[in-house]
Amino acid sequence: MLVSIRNKYRHLPKQVKASLWFLVCAFFEKSISIIATPIFTRIMSASEYGQFNVLYSWLTIVTIIVSLNLCYGVYTQGLIKFSHDRRRYSAALQGLAVVLVLTWTLIYLGFRDFWNNVFSLTTTQMLAMLLMVWTSSVFNFWAGERRVALQYKSLVVVTLLVAIAKPVVGVLLVVYANDKVTARFLGLALVELVGYTGLFFVQMYRGKTFFSRYFWRHALMFNIPLAPHYLSQIVLSSADRIMIANMVNTKSAGIYSLAYSLSQIMILFNVALSQTLSPWIYQKIKDRRVADIAGVAYDALVLIAVVNLLLIAFAPEIVSIFAPRAYAKATWIVPPIAMSVFFIFAFDLFAKFEFYYERTSLIMIASVIGAVLNVALNYWLIPILGYEVAGYTTLICYVMYAVVHYWFMNRICREKLGTLPYDRKILGLITLTFLAVGFLFLGGYHSVVLRYLLILITAVVGFSKRDYLMTIVNQMLRVRKPI
């Protein structure tokens, strides 16, 4: 049997092998992080765990401001647009990222007392944060180029080594440190510095370009208007934890952070599918063959819905495994955030058209509306209904976010292509079915018998549709072609 599997694997097309390994790699990376969660929730108090997650939330915000998220958006698009000159393009953007990080580091050092007070962080934490902005950019530039070229072996090795080292080093530092929050954060920074620095020199050596006026201008003109979009995305995903810490307490922020982290397990499906589909979708748009996209997109949405329903169904057991009883309330926060993951994937499908046609102003408008609504709802409802309501405000905002991007996508497609890529009725059917089943499982949390009866019914339906589900998985693997 093993020989048969090995032979089948050897005869798979390169694009299928690459897609398979990208998915396995994403799973493994996230799995290690998840496996480490119950260790950190037990060697750190709920308050310390909350403080670390607030610190990490600040990192995601600072990353946007400092690096402009150059390794996303413009970079993926640029690898396709400048396919004849990828190495110089990659090296030039690495150089631009260095300049941006150094500039902001000097700005911080010149007024560090002011910035420390603004973020309520120490100098050590701030410098580690700036270092991680650079190291994460280095890795994402290198990894993006590997994915587009379907060169998966080196990417898998680097990703897995760093993924294993992060929790190992983190546990060792936290156990022996008095300041466990800073120790946990420094562990991440140290591993990334050692693991990713060499990748910077690899791309610089291959591209032999630090400064390119054309590439730098293209990247800045594309991504600066997107900064509000990226910041708004971070506000949608991180502001709730910061607001809970400030409006309630860090212990509540820790409980909410656990629910958010567990719900975000399924974001790896979003990432894996998006990384697999993005070059293919961009190529279809370029070839004006958008009719080919719909079937694959519907199947992808069904797959994302299924995996998130699995998380919602078993949330009580998952929370009890990953944290002590002090975190029990996190169970009730998991479902709305897991449902949000579905809408994150949906809006990404719609936004591909906005990115391709460089309609960054529309992307910015949708993102800012979602972020402002999220902050306003949290500010209004958390004092009234408690911090748990932040999960539902997140869901409401992502639903609105996806709807606005859908409307903008249709507007662009009518103008540029003269046709619409998706059928509104099919999208609505998939979405409403997903929400209905998700809330049924949530209602079953009051009764173990009822919940497992629902799980049994769902399992029977899933088994009867197993051929369809396998067809979806195979189709996701086969859409990739070398670009």
Predicted regions and their residues:
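Alpha-helical transmembrane segments of multi-pass membrane transport and lipid-handling proteins
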Residues: 2, 66, 70-72, 91-118, ...
